[in-house]
Amino acid sequence: ELGGECLDSPGLDLLAVFIGSEGMLGIVTEVTVKLIPKPATARVIMASFDDVVTGGNAVANVIAAGIIPAGLEMMDQTSSRMVEPFVKAGYDIDAAAILLCEADGTHEEVEEEIARMTAVLEGAGASAIAVSQSEAERMKFWSGRKNAFPAAGRISPDYYCMDGTIPRKKLAEVLTGIAGMETTHGLRCANVFHAGDGNLHPLILFDANKPGEFERAEAFGADILALCVAVGGTITGEHGVGMEKINSMCVQF
């Protein structure tokens, strides 16, 4: 039995080691979880940026300010142009990047955090900022990010989703690198990611019916993962290794 009634226990964190082993150290037969009350309220900021470098740096600024948003997600222009006709979330399709920052908790906590995040984003160079004024508008802002994957199917026969994770301060550098790879491999890439923890989900768009495109998509994905490792990151943050990333393990180790 690992863990306990406290979220963190003193000494070695064997619970994290066991979970992180992904089944190599044993099989979980029973899980005990703690239920917490649903936050009383939540609001989200939608910030637009004129370039991905500024947007990436804004993410680092939010975290550096000691703010821990309930949600911190980012989409590049390819992604916002992909989803806006599909869900009409109100995204600025001329913006190079869209950042969604959510605060939840009591009314007073949310208002304070929204004010702090707004100040940080304005200082980081956001070209436009909108704050949800109702639950319906909050869900509308989020609808674009949540529908990024099905929206990709509207503009491309196939897509290849990656799962690299990088230090947040390297977001701008990696996004710039991925843009260069689009030219190298001759394929488009829509970037959507969990900006708060640096977990990238680039969607490489291709057509498997065209000879060579699948192989180019695989090579593109391998290059993205190699870049993630080069900047101090890892080849997977959520999806695991499996068969898909087995060759990239040699890059990681």
For the regions a language model picked out, list residue spans one by one.
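Glycine-rich beta-alpha junction loops
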Residues: L35, D51, D76-S79, A103-H107, ...
